[in-house]
From Swiss-Prot:
The keyword Hydrolase applies. It comes from Microplitis demolitor bracovirus (isolate Webb) (MdBV). It is an enzyme of class 3 (hydrolase). The gene is H3. One of its GO terms (biological process) is symbiont-mediated suppression of host innate immune response. This is Tyrosine phosphatase H3.
Length: 320
C-alpha cells in the first residue's frame, strides 16, 4: 500500500516465518501496526438522524464510498389476507429507505465479490432482502447465532421447511435444510410479489463462531469458504444472469465477517500468484468495510487458517 511497506511472502517464506518461536508475538505487533494506519473517508449516511435506528451498533460505522445503496420503492402496503399459518407476516409495508449498513468489498482481483453487512434487525430485514434482490445475490453467509431479543441478529429466514416470511413485497420461503458437518445450508426461494418473480437463494449458516473468539478448528471455516465458492461457481454456470456479490454478515459485520473475507482473499492470492500478504489484505478490506478484523485474535486466526490450508494442500500432493 502507498506509504506502508508490508512483506509479501511466497509459500516457503510464509512457512519459515510462521515456524519462528516468536511468530505469534510478531502477529500481534503487526496487527497493531495495521490498526494504526489512518484511513480517510466519510460516514455521513451512517450519522444521518433518520438512519441511526437502522444501525445495530452506534460505534460501528459504515463508509460512504463503499456503501450499498438501495432504491426507493415508496411505502406501499401489501395485503396478504388470511395466511395459512405457514406464512408469517413480519411487515406488510415496503421500506422506502435507500440506506443499509452494508459495504461492497473486493475479492482478490475481483471487484465487489462480497457485500459485508451487519446482522439484520427486525426493522431492517426488509431492507436486507431488498438488497439481496436488487444486487442479484444468490449466496448468503451468516456467521452468527440469531436471538429472539434481536440483540445479535434477527431470524430473517425460517429454520423449518415450507414456512415463509413476508417483508413487504418480498416473501422468503424455506425449501430445504441440509445439515453439513459444521454448518447448515438452506435453500430459500425469494419472491418479489410486485413483479411475481422468484429465484433460489443458498444460505450458509455457521453459528459456532463467538463474537470475541475463533473457531477451534480452522478446517471448518476453510470447508465453509470452499463450499460457498463452489456454489457460486455452479450458479455462474447455470443461472440466467450472473450472480451478484456474496452477502456475508455476523452481528456487527466487521470482525468475523472481515476475517472470513480476509481468508478468502488470501487463499485466492495464493492460488493465483503463490504469494500472500495478510496485512495488505486486511488493510484493503478495512478501506471498504470500516473497522474490519479489529481483534488481534481474529488477525492471528487468518494466519492459522492460511497455514492450515497450505499444510493440507501439501499433504494432498505428496501423500494421497
Amino acid at each position: 500500500m502507498p506509504g506502508y511497506c508490508f512483506e509479501i511472502f511466497n509459500v516457503f517464506d510464509f512457512f519459515d516465518k510462521t515456524n519462528k518461536a516468536n511468530f505469534w508475538e510478531f502477529v500481534r505487533l503487526e496487527h497493531a501496526q495495521v490498526m494504526d494506519i489512518p484511513i480517510s473517508g466519510t460516514v455521513n449516511h451512517f450519522l444521518k438522524p433518520e438512519n441511526l435506528r437502522k444501525n445495530r451498533y452506534h460505534d460501528v460505522t459504515c463508509w460512504d464510498n463503499s456503501r450499498v445503496v438501495l432504491s426507493s420503492h415508496g411505502s406501499k402496503m401489501y395485503d396478504y389476507g388470511d395466511s395459512d399459518g405457514k406464512k408469517i407476516i413480519v411487515t406488510s409495508q415496503d421500506s422506502d429507505s435507500t440506506y443499509i449498513h452494508a459495504s461492497f468489498v473486493n475479492g482478490f482481483k475481483e471487484a465487489n465479490k462480497f457485500i459485508c453487512c451487519q446482522g439484520p434487525k427486525e426493522s431492517t430485514s426488509g431492507d436486507f432482502w431488498k438488497m439481496v434482490s436488487e444486487h442479484n445475490s444468490s449466496v448468503i453467509v451468516s456467521l452468527t447465532e440469531t436471538d429472539d431479543e434481536d440483540q445479535v441478529c434477527y431470524e430473517y429466514w425460517v429454520k423449518e421447511e415450507d414456512y415463509e416470511l413476508a417483508f413487504g413485497r418480498y416473501v422468503v420461503k424455506t425449501l430445504e435444510i441440509i445439515e453439513e458437518s459444521s454448518f447448515t445450508r438452506t435453500r430459500l426461494r425469494l419472491t418479489d410479489v410486485s413483479s411475481d418473480t422468484s429465484r433460489e437463494i443458498h444460505h450458509f449458516w455457521y453459528p459456532h463462531w463467538s463474537d470475541y473468539g475463533n473457531p477451534t478448528n480452522p478446517a471448518e471455516i476453510l470447508n465453509l469458504i470452499s463450499k460457498v465458492n463452489q456454489k457460486r461457481k455452479e450458479m455462474k454456470k447455470t443461472a440466467d444472469s450472473q450472480p451478484g456479490p456474496i452477502v456475508v454478515h455476523c452481528s456487527a459485520g466487521i470482525g468475523r465477517t472481515g476475517t472470513f473475507c480476509t481468508i478468502d482473499n488470501a487463499l485466492s492470492q495464493l492460488r493465483k500468484e503463490q504469494t500472500v500478504c495478510l496485512p495488505q489484505t486486511v488493510l484493503k478490506i478495512r478501506k471498504q468495510r470500516h473497522s474490519s478484523v479489529f481483534l488481534p485474535e481474529q488477525y492471528a486466526f487468518c494466519y492459522k487458517a492460511v497455514r492450515y490450508a497450505l499444510i493440507r494442500e501439501i499433504k494432498k500432493k505428496f501423500f494421497y
